[in-house]
């Protein structure tokens, strides 16, 4: 059975993508003694499945590391979870910790399946069956606005952490999707859209998403909002 230590039945969910795997694994390692961590691959259906579980009140909290499905929705990739991604949390009073994992890319199948209109873009053959497309500064701006509006509507406590040094394994110096201008477009749009409050906070960190220190920051954010939330519900 699913279990937790000291908090009753707490089911914590995370989103993972290949290029954010080190982050998710590090977070899981730090929390697995206290929570049963359910990891969903952010492939469109993964995000949808997670949100169905949340809507059924089977999840008591979320660490949404990889919001990459939003990039597919905005940029026209094949792994979108649809325009309602994140909407379920507006109806649920559960802790939400999020980040912008892999929003630097949209996804397609094999290279020859990429629509012709994208053939002039920065493309990366992840493997023979997966081609990644770098999101542009304008797309990143739209992603920031999309996520910001959704975060503002969330009912429960929110901490959204931004790793300023890169959003995926291939978004760092010397790698194909390193584009500080595009990343900054996302950050600026999110900051302009997001409404900080006593319950909702945006946190910028001078780290890469796969740094151990960033994983620890996610865990700290989780503990900051999940533990008080659990105590208030059982008091």
Predicted regions mapped to residue ranges:
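Gly/Ser/Thr-rich loops at beta-strand to alpha-helix junctions
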Residues: 15-23, 43-45, 67-70, 102-105, ...
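Glycine-rich phosphate/diphosphate-binding loop of Rossmann-like nucleotide-binding domains
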Residues: 12-44, 48, 52-55
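C-terminal non-catalytic interaction/assembly regions of soluble proteins
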Residues: 80-84, 88-235
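Single conserved hydrophobic/aromatic residue that forms the stacking wall/gate
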Residues: 1-7, 11
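Short acidic, glycine/serine/threonine-rich loops at helix termini
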Residues: 23-29, 49-53, 73-77, 108-112, ...
């Amino acid at each position: 059975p699913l279990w937790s230590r000291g908090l009753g039945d707490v089911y914590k969910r995370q989103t993972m993508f290949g290029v954010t795997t080190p982050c998710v694994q590090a977070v899981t390692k730090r929390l697995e003694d206290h929570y049963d961590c359910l990891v969903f691959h952010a492939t469109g259906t993964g995000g949808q499945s997670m949100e169905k579980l949340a809507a059924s009140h089977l999840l008591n909290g979320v660490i949404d590391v990889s919001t990459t499905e939003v990039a597919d929705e905005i940029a026209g990739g094949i792994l979108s979870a649809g325009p309602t991604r994140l909407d379920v949390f507006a109806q649920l009073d559960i802790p939400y910790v999020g980040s912008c994992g892999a929003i630097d890319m949209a996804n397609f199948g094999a290279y020859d399946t990429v629509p012709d209109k994208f053939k002039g873009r920065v493309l990366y053959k992840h493997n023979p069956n997966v081609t990644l497309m770098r999101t542009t500064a304008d797309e990143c701006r739209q992603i920031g606005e999309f996520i910001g509006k959704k975060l503002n509507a969330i009912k429960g406590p929110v901490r959204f952490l931004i790793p300023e040094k890169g959003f995926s394994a291939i978004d760092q110096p010397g790698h194909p999707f390193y584009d500080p201008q595009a990343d900054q477009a996302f950050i600026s749009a999110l900051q302009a859209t997001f409404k900080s409050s006593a319950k909702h906070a945006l946190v910028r960190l001078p780290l890469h998403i796969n740094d151990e220190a960033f994983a620890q920051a996610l865990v700290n954010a989780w503990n900051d909002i999940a533990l008080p939330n659990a105590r208030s519900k059982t008091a």
